[in-house]
């Protein structure tokens, strides 16, 4: 029997976990790549530290074994690093770490898995509204998410004719642990973020997961940037 496999990074919580559970509910085998384990019955956990550029040498065989026999692979680059930094303060080491997690690791996974990805497979990048705009205090994140959109567009062009499609889903402010860790416990800040969207609320991880699923299964959106942000209020 042919197998469809979701390979997803950072699925121990938030958007990643919601996505993994959604695919699993539809019969997909799920392989999670993260340092923290995934709470998903039947899920395959690969404890790879994507912030270490040398992970390929030690763990590539384990990853390839986890997708053996897959007729279709949906690769979802979800893991992300969000830091508090700015142009006057950001040093090379911290920028390099953000780029490693948010851009370089996805390309490492692309190169490793593409030889075993057949027609009908997909690569979905999880970007951010900040992939096409900027706010103060998140320089490394803004830079890396802009670069991720470029990587998606290059993926579309370089894989033309192979039957593998790609897209970049750019969530707005989503109610995740990462967002709450970044802004702190100030409910007023969270309220302000919610007020920046036309529905007046934060996005749920499940809503983004549904968008990722749609992009993974529909090749017509190949090369597209898909904004999942409830509509932003322009001020």
Segments predicted by a language model, with ranges:
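Conserved NAD(P)H cofactor-binding loop of Rossmann-fold oxidoreductase domains
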Residues: 78-83, 231
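Substrate-binding pocket helix/loop in short-chain dehydrogenase/reductase
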Residues: 86-87, 91-97, 193
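Active-site helix of classical SDR
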Residues: 110, 144, 152
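Alpha-helical segment proximal to the catalytic Tyr-Lys
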Residues: 115, 157-158
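C-terminal substrate-recognition "lid" of short-chain dehydrogenase/reductases
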Residues: 201-228
């Amino acid at each position: 029997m042919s197998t469809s496999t979701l390979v997803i990074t950072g699925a121990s919580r938030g958007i990643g976990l919601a996505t993994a559970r959604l695919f699993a509910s539809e019969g997909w085998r799920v392989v999670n790549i993260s340092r923290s384990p995934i709470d998903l019955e039947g899920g395959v956990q690969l404890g790879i530290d994507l912030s270490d550029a040398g992970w390929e040498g030690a763990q590539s065989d384990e990853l390839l074994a986890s997708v053996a026999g897959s007729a279709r692979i949906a690769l979802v680059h979800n893991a992300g690093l969000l830091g508090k930094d700015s142009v006057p303060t950001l040093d090379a080491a911290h920028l390099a770490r953000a780029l490693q997690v948010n851009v370089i690791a996805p390309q490492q996974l692309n190169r490793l898995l593409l030889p075993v990805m057949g027609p009908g497979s997909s690569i979905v990048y999880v970007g951010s509204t900040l992939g096409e705009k900027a706010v103060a205090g998140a320089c490394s994140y803004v830079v890396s998410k802009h670069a991720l959109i470029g990587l998606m567009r290059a993926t579309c062009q370089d894989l033309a004719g192979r039957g593998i499609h790609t897209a970049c889903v750019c969530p707005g402010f989503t109610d995740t642990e990462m967002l709450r860790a970044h802004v702190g416990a100030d409910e007023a800040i969270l309220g302000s973020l919610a007020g920046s969207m036309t529905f007046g609320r934060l996005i749920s991880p499940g809503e983004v997961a549904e968008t990722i699923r749609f992009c993974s299964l529909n090749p017509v959106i190949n090369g597209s940037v898909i904004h999942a942000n409830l509509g932003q209020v322009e001020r």
